[in-house]
Amino acid sequence: VDEHNAVRKACGVFDVSHMGEVLVSGPEAEKFVQYIFTNDIAGAPVGKIYYGMMLHENGGTVDDLLVYKMADDKFFLVINAANIDKDYAWIEAQAKAFDVVTENQSDTYGQIALQGPESEKVMAECLGLVCEDLAFYTFKTVDTEGETLIVSRTGYTGEDGFEVYGSHAYIQGAWGKLIAHGVKPCG
């Protein structure tokens, strides 16, 4: 109940580092992602995030995922933890018909989700990440502490919230700062 109340009334933090991340790049990156993804991303602006599914040819679900458009030729896919190996193998198999490079970066990134009505304020005060410019389902990259983070206004709690992707060292440090700031750990 304490975790629920923190997210509904203030702010809670979730360690979601178990999620998988796949980078797709190359001259046919948009064409490839359009092919494997159910949502229409053709001509999408850089900085936009889409939720949808990857489907088998018979219409069965491979997995649901988030697609981040990093550049016209670069996309960041966030897949479910239990399906990382299966999903990546499927993505690689589909990619053979396209001029793209796929990279499983699941071991590279850690991720925290800061959720609740005070999450924007806490992101700025505690982590120095100003996010008032982010609309829901958009992201930006932020250079801080010697690395580039991916910061998105996303989440599944029904409250305002943010997800931060960075090195495991950065995420561990951010977690410590948030807990020291009084943010409730959740999940």
What do the PLM-derived regions correspond to, one by one?
Residues 1-187:
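Basic, glycine/lysine-rich polyanion-binding surfaces/domains
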